[in-house]
Amino acid sequence: MGFLTPKSFGEQAEDFACKMMKKKGYHILQRNARSRYGELDIIALHGEVVVFCEVKARQGAVSGSAGEAIDGRKQRQLGRLAEAWRLANPAWMAAPCRFDAVLVAREAQGWHAEIVQDAFQLGW
């Protein structure tokens, strides 16, 4: 395992997350969707549900819960980002949505990921 810059590490982690999501039946709609509120890592369709997915990457074993990785402030930010995306993409406005997390780790044996469906809910 060679040295990766933080940017390169994050990009590789997101690539691996997308690969794992596709294996689990997700259809990737968009990556790195930016707005004035920040950036959504991955937007996907899982069945009829629009999924806003946050990728959390670490060197070493995946440990802890998605709730620990995505605090309340980050959850609110992701909610604002999701709402902005839905407003900009009205075809998806009526579709149900949820927030998933992909916890990605790079270990000596390679990449590992855990997909956490409904990692948090905002109540809207």
Curated annotation (Swiss-Prot):
CDD domains tied to this protein: PoNe_Nuclease
GO molecular function: nucleic acid binding
Pfam families, sorted: UPF0102
Similarity remark: Belongs to the UPF0102 family.
Recorded superkingdom: Bacteria
InterPro entries: Restrct_endonuc-II-like, tRNA_endonuc-like_dom_sf, UPF0102_YraN-like
This protein's name: UPF0102 protein Mmc1_3298
